[in-house]
Amino acid sequence: GSANDQLAIADMRDLADSENFILVYPDAFPDPNSGQETNWQVVTSGDLPFTLPNPHSDILFIDQLIDHLHLEVNIDLNRVYALGYSNGGGFTFDLGCRLNNKITGIGVVARTMYAETYDNCIVTHPTPVVTILGDEDYISNYDGITYEGTLYYQSSDATHEYWIANNNLLPTSNLSSVPNINTTDGSTVELYSWSSEDECIDLYHYKVIGGGHDWPGTFGNMDIVSHEKIWEHLSEY
């Protein structure tokens, strides 16, 4: 993928102008160990069936990018958010864990947590999270992915249980209806939310019933616009 690919999927420029926030679409740092490809390097141990041990990581790149933006345009370091789709969503979970000291909140579309990210996640502050996932996504399976007895992707439930526990949220979710404004897209949306006792931090999950490996609002479900919903929630923090 590339920055232009993500821009085509989720063009947030008008939203950034109207809401007055700085918007950045970075390209992944070229991986010297993998033919200079620019896919986000999420895990480095080779634990996934399609990866080999690789010391290259884009975490340091994003770490330095945040510092650069602070120096160049004086971004508010207390309000830095990351969002991503598919592999970029896995990388976003990784940022929320491994760069938690610099990431305020995250939004992830069409991905659950990698098992390695889940096992090594270190959260230093309550972290608002928004997830959007179709229950018929056969690339980022809603129930997780296990291959030859090894768990590679956590289920959606396990992913949310992690953030519920580490954000000290109440375990019971609130279910809200989402209007089915497009009756021809073959899907509907349910919104699940969890809050802390003082309602200072939240977790939101948009479950797309009948949804695939999509970015709702651009393709697939058309009842919500993924990036608008993510900003709506994360901008509260």
Where are these regions (language model features)?
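Short beta-strand/loop motif that positions the catalytic acidic residue
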Residues: 131-133
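Acidic, glycine-rich loop-and-strand cores that form catalytic or ligand-binding grooves
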Residues: 148-186
